[in-house]
Amino acid sequence: MNRLFLSVSVALSATTCSFAQQITQPNLVLFIADDCSYYDLGCYGSVDSKTPNIDNFATQGVRFTQAYQAAPMSSPTRHNLYTGLWPVGSGAYPNHTCADQGTLSVVHHLHPLGYKVALIGKKHVAPKSVFPFDLYVPSEKGELHFISYSEIYR
């Protein structure tokens, strides 16, 4: 009886492990737009803006209804979003400044989970050690490099 129980337990464990390996992780996609509010997107009820692709995308994922930004400027807000820290806490305040060396970003937390992290478009975060994106595709403006004021005056 004990051998039968052990055999069944081992077989079930192996089956469970093989099923666990087949589970795929969800894709995480975050849209960030400067000067955009819920009045600007159809998925939030705008009748003036036609955003069918974003609206369709929103039906397949999570839509936030209680979100607030940490700063009224682009760079500190992006640093806050990517690090989870208030801009002052990461060293990224005021605008066009760098996060402190050693600050962990979403990239550092997602890599151990097997994710590849890309940034497409406007960057406005630095230094690269804090934001080591696997892929960066600059916007049409060619923002390949972001040089902060704090880097210039160090």
Give residue ranges: language-model regions:
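Formylglycine-dependent sulfatase
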Residues: 4, 19-154
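Bacterial N-terminal signal peptides
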Residues: 7-15
